[in-house]
Amino acid sequence: STTPLSVLEFARLVQDVIPAGVFNVITGSGSKSGQYMLDHPGFRKLAFTGSTEVGRNVALAAAQKLIPATLELGGKSANIFFEDCDWEMAMDGLQMGILFNQGQVCCAGSRVFVQESIYDRFVEEAVKRFNKVKVGLPWKEETQMGSQIDRRQMEKILKYVEIGKEEGAKVLCGGVQAKEGELEKGCFLRPTLLGDVTNDMRVAQEEIFGPVACIIKFKTEEEVLAMANDSAYGLGGAVWTRDINRALRVARGVETGRMWVNTYNAIPEGAPFGGCKASGIGRETHKVILEHYTQMKNIMINMAEAPTGFYPA
């Protein structure tokens, strides 16, 4: 409802390629046009990408009609850094995980777990790099991070920063609106890192959906696996290490739909993407999605030339 232009442009581009009626775009608020679609009796399949709260309503609407629904919902993904990680790759992955698209990504690496032995150095370097990120207008070549989608979302993010401070977290950098010059009237935020975070804090458990990362210290592989899985969500995540055996153990151990190893936010075509737990149902960007849009049918032909004999004449 707040980003109609891109899909309308896509519709314009494909209108001469696919038959009329195959692809339709309905704009409007989710509470009105979206709810109308949920209530309409003509749909035989529902799909939704968005918040877990709205996703539950979509699932209920599908259940009432006895039709399938695929849901790609919220996340609070774990970005895990072990002491043997490649330093430059790790710093790049930290920023890509939480600053890409201004943090407005369902699989954003918003819980940053850092091994105790490198924690202080990691935090110091991360703060330096976050403070160097160029926040600006999206059409400028030098801009690295643009604005939040609207003022309501910006205010929600800033409220979570305050919640974190009340819980005992420390704002290491950012946490404020960027208002310099031409940014003054926009919804621009400074890249934000929260330190002294524990995994039970609201800022570590609830989806903020913005450029805010919570840094959490851990000692052992077993400890970080337990914390990573102590979440209602399970959409994305990453592990940074030079030890392939550890990488595979952690990747397998985290209950999530996708785990990256030494990268983040790589979403290639052909690789299934979707969530576990409150992060959704079904997988996209892979041929398995076709199973959600089709129904298997069985036609059985009797090849026998005699009756069953169960009911003799």
Give the predicted meaning of each segment:
Residues 80, 134, 161, 167, ...:
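Conserved C-terminal structural/oligomerization subdomain of aldehyde/semialdehyde dehydrogenase
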Residues 1-13, 26-32, 82-85, 217-221:
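ATP-dependent adenylate-forming carboxylate-activation enzymes
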Residues 2-5, 31-32, 53-54, 245-246, ...:
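Short alpha-helical
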Residues 1-21, 44, 66:
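Conserved small-residue-rich beta-alpha loop and adjacent elements
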Residues 8-9, 38, 57-61, 125, ...:
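Short amphipathic alpha-helical segments
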Residues 12, 35, 56-60, 248, ...:
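Active-site phosphate/pyrophosphate- and oxyanion-stabilizing loops and adjacent acidic/basic residues
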Residues 17-18, 39, 45, 51-198, ...:
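ALDH superfamily catalytic-core signature
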Residues 25-44:
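A structured beta-alpha segment of the ubiquitous adenosine-cofactor-binding alpha/beta core
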